[in-house]
Curated annotation (Swiss-Prot):
The keyword Electron transport applies. Heme b b566 binds at H102, H203. This is Cytochrome b. Heme 1 (or BL or b562) is low-potential and absorbs at about 562 nm, and heme 2 (or BH or b566) is high-potential and absorbs at about 566 nm. Component of the ubiquinol-cytochrome c reductase complex (complex III or cytochrome b-c1 complex) that is part of the mitochondrial respiratory chain. The b-c1 complex mediates electron transfer from ubiquinol to cytochrome c. Contributes to the generation of a proton gradient across the mitochondrial membrane that is then used for ATP synthesis. It holds the Pfam family Cytochrome_B. One of its GO terms (biological process) is mitochondrial electron transport, ubiquinol to cytochrome c. Binds 2 heme b groups non-covalently. One of its GO terms (cellular component) is respiratory chain complex III.
Amino acid sequence: MTIRNQRFSLLKQPIYSTLNQHLIDYPLPSILSYWWGFGSLAGICLVIQIVTGVFLAMNYTPHVDLAFNSVEHIMRDVEGGWLLRYMHANGASMFFIVVYLHIFRGLYYASYSSPREFVWCLGVVIFLLMIVTAFIGYVLPWGQMSFWGATVITSLASAIPVVGDTIVTWLWGGFSVDNATLNRFFSLHYLLPFILVGASLLHLAALHQYGSNNPLGVHSEMDKIAFYPYFYVKDLVGWVAFAIFFSIWIFFAPNVLGHPDNYIPANPMSTPPHIVPEWYFLPIYAILRSIPDKAGGVAAIALVFISLLALPFFKEMYVRSSSFRPIYQGIFWLLLADCLLLGWIGCQPVEAPFVTIGQISSFFFFLFFAITPILGRVGRGIPKYYTDETHRTGSFS
């Protein structure tokens, strides 16, 4: 190949070379398990949500008198509209399932530790953006649960000292949840997924700066292989399993993860007996309800994300992987069970004994983050698998 042909070769073009560097030739530890495939699955979920959302927006009308009927029009009259809506609605649930598994994998293998602090913090920001996007999207069908969920959650901003009431009025566009609120939420719901794409690309770039963690929790530049074709084929297994799982929900149980009250048009004069958010908000909602004071509940929610953001900056542990930390491993599984319990409590009425159980579960949730720095310094177990760098430096960083 001549010098001129080399200059104009496809491999030399900036866009292709970047894709080749991050998606094809990117080196990964050879011992990665299937738990490392949820990042790519999250990307697939985000693409599904954006594509289906754009087509749904073509037929949706953001007006309080027309929104509910426009959703029914999509379901009944638009060609393939039912499939678009069920893919979008259940796709949100799949997205959160994948991301929750991704987060818990990071907690189990301490993927947040140095030098990947920025990767973890970006992931927490992405998680927060997902919650905001999903919440305002849940309002758009303008059913009973949409309307009253928007009323309850947005009114929480009034707990902010001095400016709280002003923020609530600004969010509503008036003195109650109404047409201005719906228009604002529709605009934001269309915008935020593209911000999520940008944040995800930053997350990926930050990850590739230092490379992925591995099940052993030790650093090595020696035993690595290219993403393509090895991990592409490995991830492909997860993609197929995900497609089957996703299809079961779409075609056989499309409304199971929703709430039947949302098939009733919004009525400001009739309050549902029990206001429940989508299932993926339930653990956080349970923490919010476990504190009777509104300001305390809002502070607890803020503390959830502050705890996640602060996790990488605790004192570094001797060994990252929970495979060699039996005490932390036991506490981790208790945390997982606690989060499932919080999810169940979140959909129960605000009465005894559910309130008490929610308070105990919320206490343990925060206790986990409080004792994690201590657990990082006890139960030291040295892996038998050393890399050349570990021998040379005597560290597991």
